[in-house]
Amino acid sequence: MKKSFIISAAALSLFALQARGEKLGELLHNFTYQARIGYNLGGTAPIGMPATIRTLHSYTLQPNLLLGIDAHYPLDNKWGLMVGLPFEGKGMKIDAGVKNYHMTMMKGGEQLEGMFTGNVITKVDQSLATIPVQATYDVSEKLRLKLGPYFSYVTAHKFEGNAYDGYLRQGDPTGPKVELGHEDGERGEYDFSSDMRNWQFGIDVGADWYFSKRCGAYVGLTWGLSEVFKKDFHVIEQSMYPIYGTIGLSYQLK
């Protein structure tokens, strides 16, 4: 009797495992996978142009490549879910004119803090591993829309630059005046890399267009909702957010 019970229990367990395996296999079979390559274009900036930033002299493109893979699961013939893992760069280099812009910088081995009027060059480099989780809607067989949150871990970051051709009023706009020139040694240097966050999150919206069965193109926009700097960082008075557009190509693996 006991032996029969053990055999029956073992058989039921095998049937249950087989049924679960079939369901898991069916679930995995419905996934499709894509590889992506793209380019990010944008910047780390405040929301709205503050009055202290007067002009943008130049914007220099950076090697903001994106390489990733994502998986899509259809919920019905229109809606689905997509999750991905892109490794990407988000960087910028700008030259801007500012007035009464609060800054901390080094000049001649001395730290200066106050209100700067003149020109600033800022370079931002970030390397990130990102997980977007998006709802998808298939407008047609060729066009898919996507929207959802993203979460990024910043594996490396840099925020540095220099101030030149202007002057710094130490402390406040009426403080002692320090002249800054154009040549090396005459500029004020700054580096806020250690004040940047390691985690970011925001909204990711985009569209995929398939021009063949496996190949396609895509566009996207990632809008950061978390500031790039830590809470206790107050040198730059405006909150700074990563805002980038993406354009690229995709290839369906399965």
Task: Please state what every model-predicted region is.
Residues 209-210, 241-254:
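Outer-membrane beta-barrel "beta-signal"
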Residues 43-62, 90-127, 154-200, 226-244:
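Extracellular/periplasm-exposed beta-strand and loop segments of Gram-negative cell-envelope proteins
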Residues 28, 74-76, 140, 212-214, ...:
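Outer-membrane beta-barrel channels and translocator barrels
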Residues 71-73, 137, 153, 209-211, ...:
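Residue-level signature of outer-membrane beta-barrel architecture
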Residues 78-81, 142-145, 213-219:
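Repeated loop/turn-to-beta-strand initiation elements of outer-membrane beta-barrel proteins
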Residues 35-41, 83-89, 147-153, 219-223, ...:
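Transmembrane beta-barrel strands of outer-membrane/channel proteins
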Residues 31-33, 63-69, 129-133, 201-205, ...:
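Hydrophobic, lipid-facing positions within transmembrane beta-strands of outer-membrane proteins
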Residues 17-34, 77-78, 100, 164, ...:
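Outer-membrane beta-barrel biogenesis signature
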